[in-house]
Amino acid sequence: MTAIDLSSYAGLTAMVLLTINILVGLLISVRYSPVRSWPHRQIPVFDIHNWTAYIALALVGLHPTILLFSATAKFRWFDILWPLGSPGQRLYNCFGACAFYLLLVVVITSYLRRRIGRPLWKLLHYLAYGVAALVYVHGTLIDPNLKNEPTDFLDGEKVLVELCGLLVIAAIIVRIRYGYSRAAARAQPGTSHAWFLDTRRVNSHTPALAAAD
């Protein structure tokens, strides 16, 4: 297994974790409660949401760093931090670098949420969707072998990225539609929302990604 292969696997794992993170964040944003939906199961949704973000951030940073140990890739530190000078596929590499920097902002501001205030945190938290978009575009278009070959959209790795992207898009659409229906339900007295998390419980945690409601 080459350094390029390891870098590719790190990137794919980060992408899957980010997908899980976004999906869990969307559930948190509607105050979904697994305990109420499945009384005999206690799923730590906040822990899952936080740790998938932290591990994904580490893997996104590791993903290009591994290329420093590849004689074929010919990447330098500066190429990783500023991909406009990278050996090839500069635009796609820039997408990946921007995703890392935005993800770093989202995670750091989540730690500082109480200091910066909820309104600013919530606004910055929406950058998570930009992170996801950049990751999916980067993962779909870049050549995993770094040979500038045309994209094979039916390649196994590409299909995985495409499916994750479509899943997140579908979940966001459902979330938006639900937001409209919930707004309409609020106007009707006696509507039950027993399967949502208590608002105080949501606000007492600091989720790392995509849980802004």
Describe these PLM feature segments.
Residues M1-D213:
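Membrane-embedded alpha-helical bundles that constitute the cytochrome b-like, heme-associated redox core
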